[in-house]
Structures are given as structure tokens and as C-alpha cells.
Amino acid sequence: MPPGAKVPQAEIYKTSNLQGAVPTNSWESSILWNQYSLPIYAHPLTFKFKAEGIEVGKPALGGSGIAYFGAHKNDFTVGHSSVYTFPDARADKISDFAVDAVMASGSGSIKATLMKGSPYAYFVFTGGNPRIDFSGTPTVFYGDSGSQCLGVTINGVNYGLFAPSGSKWQGIGTGTITCILPAGKNYFSIAVLPDNTVSTLTYYKDYAYCFVTDTKVEWSYNETESTLTTTFTAEVSVKEGTNKGTILALYPHQWRNNPHILPLPYTYSTLRGIMKTIQGTSFKTVYRYHGILPNLPDKGTYDREALNRYINELALQADAPVAVDTYWFGKHLGKLSCALPIAEQLGNISAKDRFISFMKSSLEDWFTAKEGETAKLFYYDSNWGTLIGYPSSYGSDEELNDHHFHYGYFLHAAAQIALRDPQWASRDNWGAMVELLIKDIANWDRNDTRFPFLRNFDPYEGHSWASGHAGFADGNNQESSSEAINAWQAIILWGEATGNKTIRDLGIYLYTTEVEAVCNYWFDLYKDIFSPSYGHNYASMVWGGKYCHEIWWNGTNSEKHGINFLPITAASLYLGKDPNYIKQNYEEMLRECGTSQPPNWKDIQYMYYALYDPAAAKNMWNESIVPEDGESKAHTYHWICNLDSLGLPDFSVTADTPLYSVFNKNNIRTYVVYNASSSAKKVTFSDGKVMTVGPHSMAVSTGSESEVLAGDLNGDGKINSTDISLMKRYLLKQIVDLPVEDDIKAADINKDGKVNSTDMSILKRVILRNYPL
């Protein structure tokens, strides 16, 4: 560790049962960092640990202008009849979407189990009984001192209090109700109810004694169908009765267009919209994966001379990053990662070599720590189980903030190198270090206890969290959803480039799921999340207890919008799911700015607008615009002009390969596929289109024309020595036709309109795998 470097606090509020790396950056994380906790947003319930016990609440919704709130409020506190103040609260177990926390003093203790998406909370007591201190005197709409359960209303919210059979209640009619547990039974649960009918209370009582003991999420990518299936499972222990299930409340991104669930008639109004309930212990979601690309193709309506000039300008600045901390240095790597393919497309070998040389040497420098070195290194903190890069920024060291934002840029650069140099990316060289970065932010291997499972990603809420400690009254938060998605697309590229399907599928799970969540909770594309009183069509930040139109710095409204677009890469096409929304978002930004054009970040805004009207975006952009620090003139110009030529993303068509995109202009589709493997690949699209793509190359096909694989001179779908022999005979005029249909197109590998010795040279290099088609 560098001298003077900062690390997270030494104290972790956990019991000895919580072994291995500590989960951070989650909805429940404030338990681990604090003596008690700050509000915990499990939805539909919220909680807060304090000296007297555990506050329970169902937020009231309200707000306008800059923010809309669903803040925690204390409807009642679950306390202990024999312990009036506990010294602290400690995490005892954290599973995929639930947490057990223990409060103990002497022989008295409470263990609370809180689960994301559960209307229940479960408690186990030792040395005393449950004491419920209400924020006022509740109305009891069901039960008396001898009932097994009570139905109560407090602050307009209905709850069920569920005790073991044989229990007694004291204090009914006052603000404090104590449950006297029978001998040998130490469990107690509560549930927030959708209404105050006895039938609803009875239904919830049926599952109130099925205590959740574990939760798990599993995912599966079907390459043939281009679908992602995610299965959520809660294990339960039945304390009494014969029922073995529970009630689960699903977020809109989970129930929307989901034919695999049977919703109950019970719903909850929450900050995330309506949560629908199901009965059982498991459910699944199935999403379409719409593909990503490592870069857009060379099909733009650009002036190639101007584009090449922009590339040369950037090449001169390649070794001059804005700063050397993990975030800003990472953004510089991201800028070069997007420019590298453009240099290749232009045949600008000098710029290409300069970009890739700097990217390699920089990553190797960061991945190597020497005695006495003070900067550009990573340190593993074994107390928390995390990899910290130094120099750090924005609390990435002491608070473990934003690791997925920072490291995503490093991963993107590594993936771009891996697509070109598999040897560099091998585990014997630099690949193992790249995978450590992946594991820090999204460890998929439950057996690797050096890092927590999916640190930054919330499997149930479907998106990432940025704060390591979640130490805010509004819970955890995430501002730049697009930087999270940048990390996930980089994981897809890395997995595909290195042939590691486990890592690739991890990336597809994270990317696809977060895109769904962003469309719901940041953009409200379906118009059923944001309250009309909020007054905006977009959330700059999403918190556990609010969504808002503000950012972490004193930025312009262009920045407030653009922070959820950047970095724009060939995996950012998801932003174009609803072109009309893009127009609305852009126009709202201009109204807020009070200008006819964005005051700054013009390149980001025009790249975004190009997903609605690329021709207009092309007219708005000009080379005098100062790029955002993670962007370049070359990439902005290339992006806008490609969309001007290709059209908008077409999400109605999928393919049986992970690296693809489909575009549509004037009802004519263009299909783009990248094949990262070392052999030719046949790709079938859901509309029947078939393409054959050469190894380590990108192919583009428009309309229904048959796709010709450059270099495949005999039409067998492969590029090998047979094609070399055919090319030689063709050039020597020993044959006048090649076996493949459209022989000139197949033989003209550099697409200069001629078939000559240059094409032969390229073909040989392709076979030797040192030239990308």
C-alpha cells in the first residue's frame, strides 16, 4: 500500500458468522459501517436499527421539483422486553437479497431477517419478548389479547403482527404492545398489508411463519434465442403450520411483460411504482438480449480526411491523461478504447499503434506494484475483501465508492486489447489481473471468498449501487447508470474475447438486467414510475428513498442529463429503445438550460440525439465543439455519421451470437456482427437473415442480400490455406473464376475495388491472425 494511502475503517459491524469478504455497495450496507444503521430501503418496507430496536415503516410518497421522496418513517419499533438499549447492530448473514442482523446485550437478543421485496420481517428473540413501540396509538382492526395475530393501523398503514400459537398480547389500546411468547417458541413476524380486511390479514398469516433463511439469484443466457433468464429463490423454514411458501413483491422491471408469474390481487404503491405480489418461493424473469458491438462499423457518412485528422490529433494526446486517479485515468483509457477501432478502419497504423501501445503499457503499469511505488497500483484490502486502486478518487478508497464506474474503463481497454492480442490477455500474462478487477465489482464465483458476490449489483432491484457504505438518510444511490453499464459491456467483451463463457454470460446478465432497470427507474419509458408532481421525465440519481434531478457536483442541466448517457460506446445503443423519449429528454434539457443548444457536453447530447434524428445531430455537431473529457472529436463524428448512414437501432430482431446489432433506415435493415473467435461463424437472425462472419472480424450486411465472407474464396465458410492457393492461381490467371458466388467481393479483401497482391498479403496475415478483417 502506498505511504499515506487511505483504507476503509477497521471496524466492521458483523458477527463471527459472517465470514469471507464483506458485501458492500448494497441496500443494507449501512449496517456494516455504523454502530446501528441508517434507513434501509427493502421495498415495500423500510427499516432502521437503533439502540432501542428496529424501526419499521412503509414510506409515504411525496415531493415535487428537484426530488420525489419515499423516505423512511418510523411506524413502530420492534424492541425487546428485557433490553431497552442495545450496544450495536451487527450483520450476521447476507445472502443475495436478504440480510440477518443481530442486536445483543447480555442474555437478551433480537435477530432480524429483512428481505428485499418482502412484505414481511422476521424476528427471533432470546431472553425476552417482542415489545412493539408505535409512533402513536394504533387502531386494532383485528384481534384481542388472546389472538395469535393482530391487525393494526398506524399512520394510515396496515400491519399484521404474527405470534406463535399460545402467545398473549399486553398493552392493546396503548402505544406499546408486548407479545408474551409461550415457552419454547421465540419467533415473531410482521407484515405490511395492502388493506385492513380480515381476509387479507388471514391470507398473510398463512405465510407469516415461513421464515426466510436464504436467498439466491441464478442466471442463464440462451445464445440461440438471445434471451436471459434469471431465477430468484427464497428458502424458508416453517416455524408452525403446513404452508411452505411466502409472499414476494415484484418491482415493475420484474413483473412487466412477464408471463411466468401469477400475480395475487395484492399490490403496494412504492417509490419504484406498483409492486405486484406472488405466492411461492421462486420466480423468474426472461429478457431479450439485444447485443452489443465492440465498435460501430466503417459505414458512416463522414469526410474520411477530416476523421483521420481528428484521429491524428488524439494520437498526439494519447499519453497525456487528464489525471492519474482511477476514475479520470480510466476515462482516458475509455476514450482511446473507442478511438482505436476507428484508426484501424482508416488504415492509420501509426495512430492505432500509438493507442494500443499506451493502453497496454498503462494497464501493465497499473497491474504491477513494486517496492516503494506510490501511484498507479492496486492494493488488496483483506479486512473488507476489496481491490483499491491508488491514486483513488471520490471515496473509492475509504468508502469503497464507485469501483464499477472506475474499473469499467480499465476493463473496456483490456477487452479491446484482448480482441487484438489474445496472448496479452491470457491468464499467464495479464488476464488474471483483469479478472481480479472483474471479481472486485462483480464476483460471480461463490467459492472465491476474496471478494463478495456481485459487490456493486443489486440482483433484486436490477441495478447497481455506487456508495460503499449507504450512509445516507435516503439509502444507497447511483447517479451514472451508464457508467455501470459501461463496466458490464466491458465484461461481455472480455469474456467473448478470451473465450470465457462464464464471464461473458455474467456480463450479459448484468448488462441486460441493468438496461431494463434504467429504462424503468431512470427514464420511466413506460410512464408509470414518476409521479406527475415530480415534474421531470428523467432521474439523474436514483436512491433507495428518492429519485431526483440533481447530481453530486454543481453542474449544468446538460450534465444532469448527460451523466446517464456517458460514456457512449457501441454498447450504448440501448439508449435508443424509445426514440420519441430521446426527443422529450433532449427538449426538457434545453428548457431547463434556457438555451437553444446545450451549454456544454454538446458532443454527449448530440450523440444521444442521434439515436432519434442522426441527420439533425450531424448538422448540429461541428469540430469546434470541445469534447467532454472522456470523449473525442473522432469518436463523436464517427458515431453520428454511422447512425446517419445505418439508421436507428432495431430492437425487434435478435441474433444467435453475443456481439451484434441491427439498424433500420427507411425500413431497410442493416445487420452488424463481430466474430471474436478464431474460426468463421454462421450467424442467424430472428427475421431469417443469415450471415457468415470471418474470424476476428466485423461483417455488415444490408437488406436481404447474401453475405460474402471476404477471403473465403471457395464458399466453405472458412479462411485457410485452400483460399491462399485459390488466390494465387487467380492472380496468376490460372483460373478466371473463383468457386464462391460474387468472387470479386470475396477476393477484394481491402475493398479498394481491385484484386491484387495486396489482397494476397492481407489474406496471409488473416490466416496468421495478425490482421483483423
UniProtKB/Swiss-Prot annotation:
List the catalytic residues: 402, 479, 483
GO-annotated molecular function:
calcium ion binding; endo-1,3(4)-beta-glucanase activity; glucan endo-1,3-beta-D-glucosidase activity; magnesium ion binding; nickel cation binding
Q: What class of enzyme is it?
A: hydrolase
User: In terms of domain of life, where is this protein from?
Assistant: Bacteria
Reaction catalysis annotation:
Hydrolysis of (1->3)-beta-D-glucosidic linkages in (1->3)-beta-D-glucans
Describe activation and inhibition of this protein: Inhibited by manganese, zinc, and copper ions.
E.C. number, please? 3.2.1.39
- Cofactor or coenzyme needed: Ca(2+); Mg(2+)
UniProt-annotated stretches for the region alpha/beta subdomain? 195-288
Which annotated residues bind Mg(2+) 2?
618-619, 621
The entry sums up its family as follows: Belongs to the glycosyl hydrolase 81 family.
Q: Which PANTHER family does the UniProt record give?
A: ENDO-1,3(4)-BETA-GLUCANASE 1 (PTHR31983), GLUCAN ENDO-1,3-BETA-D-GLUCOSIDASE 2 (PTHR31983:SF0)
By what name is this protein known?
Glucan endo-1,3-beta-D-glucosidase
Organism for this UniProt entry: Acetivibrio thermocellus (strain ATCC 27405 / DSM 1237 / JCM 9322 / NBRC 103400 / NCIMB 10682 / NRRL B-4536 / VPI 7372) (Clostridium thermocellum)
